[in-house]
Amino acid sequence: MTDDEVQWKPILVGGLSGLVAETLVFPLSTIITRVQSSLSFQQAGGFQHLYRGLSSVLVSTLPSASSFFFVYEYAKARQKPGVRNHLVSASVAEVVSCGILAPAEVVRQRAQISKTSVSQIFQSMIHNYRDLWHSFKGMCGRNVPATAFQFVLYEQFKKKFSATDHVFGAPKGAALSGAITAAVLTPLDVIKTQINLRPESYRKVVRRIYKENGIFGFEKGLGLRVFASSLGLSIYLGTYEHVKSHLHIRKAGEVSVA
Protein backbone atom coordinates (compact mmCIF):
# COMPACT_ATOMS: atom_id res chain seq x y z
CA MET A 1 0.00 0.00 0.00
CA THR A 2 1.55 3.32 -1.07
CA ASP A 3 1.41 6.67 0.74
CA ASP A 4 -1.16 7.91 -1.77
CA GLU A 5 -3.60 5.07 -1.20
CA VAL A 6 -6.53 5.49 1.15
CA GLN A 7 -6.02 3.46 4.30
CA TRP A 8 -9.35 2.21 5.52
CA LYS A 9 -8.05 0.55 8.68
CA PRO A 10 -7.22 3.74 10.66
CA ILE A 11 -10.62 5.11 9.63
CA LEU A 12 -12.49 2.03 10.85
CA VAL A 13 -10.44 1.63 14.03
CA GLY A 14 -10.80 5.34 14.84
CA GLY A 15 -14.57 5.19 14.46
CA LEU A 16 -14.96 2.08 16.59
CA SER A 17 -12.61 3.44 19.26
CA GLY A 18 -14.73 6.58 19.41
CA LEU A 19 -17.89 4.52 19.90
CA VAL A 20 -16.34 2.55 22.77
CA ALA A 21 -15.03 5.63 24.56
CA GLU A 22 -18.20 7.70 24.04
CA THR A 23 -20.46 4.95 25.38
CA LEU A 24 -18.37 4.37 28.50
CA VAL A 25 -17.94 8.03 29.50
CA PHE A 26 -21.39 9.26 28.42
CA PRO A 27 -22.85 9.32 31.98
CA LEU A 28 -19.98 11.59 33.06
CA SER A 29 -20.64 13.79 30.04
CA THR A 30 -24.29 14.10 31.09
CA ILE A 31 -23.33 15.12 34.63
CA ILE A 32 -20.86 17.71 33.32
CA THR A 33 -23.49 19.23 31.00
CA ARG A 34 -25.94 19.52 33.88
CA VAL A 35 -23.32 21.09 36.14
CA GLN A 36 -22.34 23.63 33.46
CA SER A 37 -25.91 24.58 32.47
CA SER A 38 -27.50 27.80 33.73
CA LEU A 39 -30.01 25.67 35.69
CA SER A 40 -29.30 24.11 39.06
CA PHE A 41 -27.97 20.55 38.92
CA GLN A 42 -31.25 19.09 40.20
CA GLN A 43 -33.37 21.20 37.82
CA ALA A 44 -31.23 19.97 34.94
CA GLY A 45 -31.93 16.35 35.87
CA GLY A 46 -29.53 15.49 38.66
CA PHE A 47 -28.33 11.90 38.47
CA GLN A 48 -31.39 10.62 36.60
CA HIS A 49 -31.39 9.27 33.02
CA LEU A 50 -27.64 9.63 32.53
CA TYR A 51 -27.77 7.97 29.10
CA ARG A 52 -30.42 10.33 27.71
CA GLY A 53 -29.33 11.61 24.29
CA LEU A 54 -26.86 8.77 23.68
CA SER A 55 -28.47 7.70 20.40
CA SER A 56 -27.67 10.98 18.65
CA VAL A 57 -24.05 10.73 19.72
CA LEU A 58 -23.63 7.11 18.64
CA VAL A 59 -25.03 7.92 15.19
CA SER A 60 -22.52 10.75 14.69
CA THR A 61 -19.48 9.38 16.53
CA LEU A 62 -18.55 6.77 13.93
CA PRO A 63 -18.39 9.18 10.96
CA SER A 64 -16.90 12.05 12.98
CA ALA A 65 -14.16 9.95 14.60
CA SER A 66 -13.47 8.15 11.33
CA SER A 67 -13.19 11.39 9.39
CA PHE A 68 -10.90 12.83 12.07
CA PHE A 69 -8.40 9.99 11.84
CA PHE A 70 -8.58 9.90 8.04
CA VAL A 71 -7.67 13.59 7.80
CA TYR A 72 -5.18 13.41 10.70
CA GLU A 73 -3.23 10.45 9.30
CA TYR A 74 -3.41 11.86 5.77
CA ALA A 75 -2.06 15.26 6.84
CA LYS A 76 0.63 13.73 9.06
CA ALA A 77 1.96 11.63 6.18
CA ARG A 78 2.43 14.73 4.01
CA GLN A 79 4.40 16.88 6.43
CA LYS A 80 7.77 16.67 8.08
CA PRO A 81 7.67 15.04 11.56
CA GLY A 82 7.49 17.37 14.53
CA VAL A 83 5.27 19.55 16.69
CA ARG A 84 4.06 21.67 13.77
CA ASN A 85 2.93 18.51 11.97
CA HIS A 86 0.78 17.37 14.89
CA LEU A 87 -0.56 20.89 15.48
CA VAL A 88 -1.68 21.45 11.88
CA SER A 89 -2.93 17.90 11.29
CA ALA A 90 -5.04 17.82 14.46
CA SER A 91 -6.51 21.29 13.82
CA VAL A 92 -7.61 20.55 10.26
CA ALA A 93 -8.96 17.13 11.23
CA GLU A 94 -10.97 18.59 14.11
CA VAL A 95 -12.68 21.22 11.93
CA VAL A 96 -13.88 18.44 9.63
CA SER A 97 -15.01 16.34 12.59
CA CYS A 98 -16.88 19.28 14.16
CA GLY A 99 -18.90 19.74 10.98
CA ILE A 100 -20.29 16.24 11.48
CA LEU A 101 -20.53 16.26 15.26
CA ALA A 102 -22.07 19.71 15.90
CA PRO A 103 -25.74 18.78 15.23
CA ALA A 104 -25.49 15.71 17.46
CA GLU A 105 -23.84 17.76 20.20
CA VAL A 106 -26.78 20.18 20.27
CA VAL A 107 -29.28 17.31 20.44
CA ARG A 108 -27.26 15.49 23.11
CA GLN A 109 -26.88 18.42 25.48
CA ARG A 110 -30.49 19.57 25.16
CA ALA A 111 -31.71 16.02 25.75
CA GLN A 112 -29.46 15.72 28.81
CA ILE A 113 -31.19 18.57 30.66
CA SER A 114 -34.79 18.17 29.45
CA LYS A 115 -37.48 15.54 29.04
CA THR A 116 -37.96 16.33 25.36
CA SER A 117 -37.33 13.37 23.07
CA VAL A 118 -34.33 13.29 20.74
CA SER A 119 -36.59 13.27 17.67
CA GLN A 120 -38.49 16.38 18.85
CA ILE A 121 -35.26 18.25 19.54
CA PHE A 122 -33.91 17.28 16.13
CA GLN A 123 -37.08 18.42 14.35
CA SER A 124 -37.07 21.81 16.06
CA MET A 125 -33.39 22.22 15.27
CA ILE A 126 -33.93 21.61 11.55
CA HIS A 127 -36.22 24.64 11.41
CA ASN A 128 -33.64 26.84 13.12
CA TYR A 129 -30.37 26.38 11.26
CA ARG A 130 -28.79 29.26 13.18
CA ASP A 131 -28.64 27.00 16.22
CA LEU A 132 -26.41 24.67 14.22
CA TRP A 133 -24.17 27.51 13.11
CA HIS A 134 -23.81 28.77 16.69
CA SER A 135 -23.06 25.23 17.82
CA PHE A 136 -20.47 24.69 15.09
CA LYS A 137 -18.68 27.93 15.94
CA GLY A 138 -18.78 27.19 19.66
CA MET A 139 -17.54 23.65 19.12
CA CYS A 140 -14.70 24.76 16.86
CA GLY A 141 -13.81 27.49 19.33
CA ARG A 142 -13.33 24.85 22.00
CA ASN A 143 -12.37 21.69 20.12
CA VAL A 144 -9.83 22.98 17.60
CA PRO A 145 -7.40 24.54 20.10
CA ALA A 146 -8.11 21.73 22.57
CA THR A 147 -7.45 18.96 20.07
CA ALA A 148 -4.37 20.65 18.61
CA PHE A 149 -2.88 21.19 22.07
CA GLN A 150 -3.96 17.73 23.18
CA PHE A 151 -2.42 15.87 20.25
CA VAL A 152 0.87 17.76 20.46
CA LEU A 153 1.09 16.69 24.11
CA TYR A 154 -0.16 13.19 23.36
CA GLU A 155 2.40 12.46 20.66
CA GLN A 156 5.21 13.62 22.96
CA PHE A 157 3.95 11.75 26.03
CA LYS A 158 3.23 8.60 24.02
CA LYS A 159 6.78 8.57 22.68
CA LYS A 160 8.21 9.06 26.16
CA PHE A 161 6.04 6.48 27.95
CA SER A 162 6.22 3.90 25.18
CA ALA A 163 10.00 3.82 25.44
CA THR A 164 9.65 1.94 28.74
CA ASP A 165 6.07 0.63 28.55
CA HIS A 166 5.02 -0.72 25.16
CA VAL A 167 1.61 -1.91 26.38
CA PHE A 168 0.31 1.09 28.34
CA GLY A 169 2.48 3.87 26.95
CA ALA A 170 -0.26 5.22 24.67
CA PRO A 171 -3.08 5.11 27.29
CA LYS A 172 -0.82 6.83 29.84
CA GLY A 173 0.12 9.55 27.36
CA ALA A 174 -3.53 10.01 26.37
CA ALA A 175 -4.69 10.23 29.99
CA LEU A 176 -2.10 12.85 30.92
CA SER A 177 -2.62 14.96 27.80
CA GLY A 178 -6.40 14.77 28.26
CA ALA A 179 -6.20 15.88 31.88
CA ILE A 180 -3.93 18.84 31.13
CA THR A 181 -6.01 19.99 28.17
CA ALA A 182 -9.28 19.73 30.11
CA ALA A 183 -7.86 21.73 33.01
CA VAL A 184 -6.62 24.52 30.73
CA LEU A 185 -9.64 24.74 28.43
CA THR A 186 -12.62 24.22 30.76
CA PRO A 187 -13.76 27.87 30.25
CA LEU A 188 -14.22 27.21 26.52
CA ASP A 189 -16.22 24.07 27.32
CA VAL A 190 -18.53 26.00 29.65
CA ILE A 191 -19.14 28.60 26.94
CA LYS A 192 -19.78 25.93 24.30
CA THR A 193 -22.22 24.09 26.56
CA GLN A 194 -24.28 27.20 27.25
CA ILE A 195 -24.34 28.16 23.56
CA ASN A 196 -25.80 24.73 22.77
CA LEU A 197 -28.39 24.94 25.53
CA ARG A 198 -29.43 28.55 24.96
CA PRO A 199 -28.36 29.77 21.52
CA GLU A 200 -26.73 33.19 21.85
CA SER A 201 -23.67 34.87 20.42
CA TYR A 202 -20.29 34.02 21.91
CA ARG A 203 -19.98 37.49 23.41
CA LYS A 204 -23.42 37.42 25.05
CA VAL A 205 -22.76 34.03 26.63
CA VAL A 206 -19.43 35.19 28.07
CA ARG A 207 -21.02 38.33 29.52
CA ARG A 208 -23.94 36.39 31.02
CA ILE A 209 -21.71 33.76 32.64
CA TYR A 210 -19.52 36.44 34.19
CA LYS A 211 -22.52 38.47 35.36
CA GLU A 212 -24.23 35.46 36.99
CA ASN A 213 -21.24 33.66 38.51
CA GLY A 214 -18.17 35.83 38.15
CA ILE A 215 -14.84 34.43 36.98
CA PHE A 216 -15.52 31.11 38.71
CA GLY A 217 -18.51 30.56 36.42
CA PHE A 218 -16.04 29.65 33.68
CA GLU A 219 -14.62 26.80 35.76
CA LYS A 220 -17.86 24.89 36.34
CA GLY A 221 -17.26 21.15 36.28
CA LEU A 222 -13.47 21.50 36.20
CA GLY A 223 -12.71 18.42 38.31
CA LEU A 224 -15.25 16.28 36.48
CA ARG A 225 -13.93 17.39 33.10
CA VAL A 226 -10.35 16.56 34.03
CA PHE A 227 -11.39 13.08 35.18
CA ALA A 228 -13.72 12.41 32.23
CA SER A 229 -11.28 13.70 29.64
CA SER A 230 -8.41 11.71 31.10
CA LEU A 231 -10.48 8.53 31.21
CA GLY A 232 -12.17 9.04 27.85
CA LEU A 233 -9.03 9.92 25.91
CA SER A 234 -7.13 7.05 27.52
CA ILE A 235 -9.81 4.61 26.34
CA TYR A 236 -10.20 6.30 22.95
CA LEU A 237 -6.56 6.61 21.90
CA GLY A 238 -5.45 3.58 23.89
CA THR A 239 -7.94 1.42 21.99
CA TYR A 240 -7.00 3.05 18.69
CA GLU A 241 -3.27 2.45 19.14
CA HIS A 242 -3.74 -1.08 20.49
CA VAL A 243 -6.00 -2.27 17.68
CA LYS A 244 -3.95 -0.38 15.10
CA SER A 245 -0.77 -2.18 16.17
CA HIS A 246 -2.48 -5.57 15.99
CA LEU A 247 -3.77 -4.81 12.50
CA HIS A 248 -0.25 -3.77 11.47
CA ILE A 249 -1.37 -0.33 10.39
CA ARG A 250 1.76 1.55 9.48
CA LYS A 251 2.80 4.92 10.78
CA ALA A 252 3.44 7.78 8.40
CA GLY A 253 6.48 7.09 6.25
CA GLU A 254 6.73 3.38 7.14
CA VAL A 255 6.25 0.51 4.75
CA SER A 256 2.93 -1.27 5.15
CA VAL A 257 3.09 -4.88 6.33
CA ALA A 258 -0.66 -5.44 6.14
UniProtKB/Swiss-Prot annotation:
InterPro entries recorded: Mitochondrial_sb/sol_carrier, Mt_carrier_dom_sf
Stretches forming Solcar repeats: 9-78, 81-160, 165-246
Any one GO molecular function term: S-adenosyl-L-methionine transmembrane transporter activity
Primary location: mitochondrion
Covalent S-S links between cysteines: none
Domain of life where this protein originates: Eukaryota
Membrane topology type: Multi-pass membrane protein
GO cellular component: mitochondrial inner membrane; mitochondrion
Transmembrane segments: 11-31, 53-73, 87-107, 139-159, 171-191, 218-239
Gene Ontology process terms (BP): mitochondrial S-adenosyl-L-methionine transmembrane transport
Family to which the UniProt record says this protein belongs: Belongs to the mitochondrial carrier (TC 2.A.29) family.
UniProt name for this protein: Uncharacterized mitochondrial carrier C1271.11
Organism encoding this protein: Schizosaccharomyces pombe (strain 972 / ATCC 24843)
